[in-house]
Amino acid sequence: MKASLLNKLDILQDRFEELTALLGDAEVISDQTRFRAYSREYAEVEPVYAAYKEWCKVQGDLEGAQALLKDSDPDLREMAVEEVREAKEQLLTLESQLQRMLLPKDPNDGRNVFLEIRAGTGGDEAAIFSGDLFRMYSRYAEKRGWRLEILSENEGEHGGYKEIIARVEGENVYGKLKFESGAHRVQRVPETESQGRVHTSACTVAVLPEPDEQAAIEINPADLRVDTYRASGAGGQHVNKTDSAIRITHLPTGIVVECQEERSQHKNRARAMSWLSAKLNDMQTSAAQNAIASERKLLVGSGDRSERIRTYNYPQGRVTDHRINLTLYSLDDILSGGVEAVIEPLLAEYQADQLAALGD
């Protein structure tokens, strides 16, 4: 194992022993905030510590077996050869496991997200495709046991959505959806096309992690213009009676967010403010992420909204993710919520890229 990795593991081992002592300290136990923080860190560090302890044990076994290779007893030497082989195999497996455990964790992976889908080029067909993408993500969310709520929607004239915004809540939502941001292209024959020609349309998807109270950007109320209006669409007759929908404009940036799905103006405002905070956070981090992606030539993860990331070709039943040259002939399954078939290879490629950087 490389000296740099061993050094990291030695530091982590010291921290594990320190955390063990802290969690047994009466002063820490009486302070629930510190106790919870140390408990979370302990839960993260303990599996790595256990794997490193096992690696050290196997490394010791290997050194012992290698010493026996010089023994005058041929039977012992033969046994030692097999033990050396087994120990080396175990060490390779453990080293690979430890490398993955040491990969830097994205602090946003566990967060809920705001999912934004907008029709791009292609008019009515792009709006219809926005609806197809929204159904794909809705079914995927259902499969994973996530909760999805629509915050704002602008329906297309012939179906689908010119724009639809949803909040997705659950376990590891951003960790799974973070590479969905970008331009999604569809190639198919529209129902209105009489000559059977294939048309190309596009939609943009943005996945924004929802910040918690500590991470949320402080927003000056003087920078906001808040408008109320009557909601339309979902909500039954009630929406025609009260101005419950909220539109918030952040004057310095021109960002506009609106929420109309709740009957309570207070709830709509809270959702809109959380979404605005997520968009402002995204503005701050995207420039830095793009710089890192450019420097390291990441195959995935730049998150550029204008970057064409995926094509859905209906005549061929094909889905191609252009970032990793992945092509799957299972369009129907993917659009029915089986997008995990694309997400997992993207995550694997990103992890491989991180491993390469870790070893540099």
Curated annotation (Swiss-Prot):
N5-methylglutamine carried by residues: Q237
Transmembrane helix keyword on record: no
PROSITE patterns: RF_PROK_I (PS00745)
InterPro entries to which the protein is assigned, alphabetical: PCRF, Pep_chain_release_fac_I, Pep_chain_release_fac_I_sf, Prokaryotic/Mito_RF, RF-1
Record localization: Cytoplasm
A Pfam cross-reference name: PCRF
Gene Ontology terms, MF aspect: translation release factor activity, codon specific
Cellular component aspect of the GO annotation: cytoplasm
Transmembrane segments annotated in the record for this chain: none
Keywords linked to the UniProt accession: Cytoplasm, Methylation, Protein biosynthesis
PTM entry text: Methylated by PrmC. Methylation increases the termination efficiency of RF1.
Record function comment: Peptide chain release factor 1 directs the termination of translation in response to the peptide chain termination codons UAG and UAA.
Family: Belongs to the prokaryotic/mitochondrial release factor family.
UniProt-recorded name of the protein: Peptide chain release factor 1
Species per Swiss-Prot/TrEMBL record: Pseudomonas putida (strain GB-1)
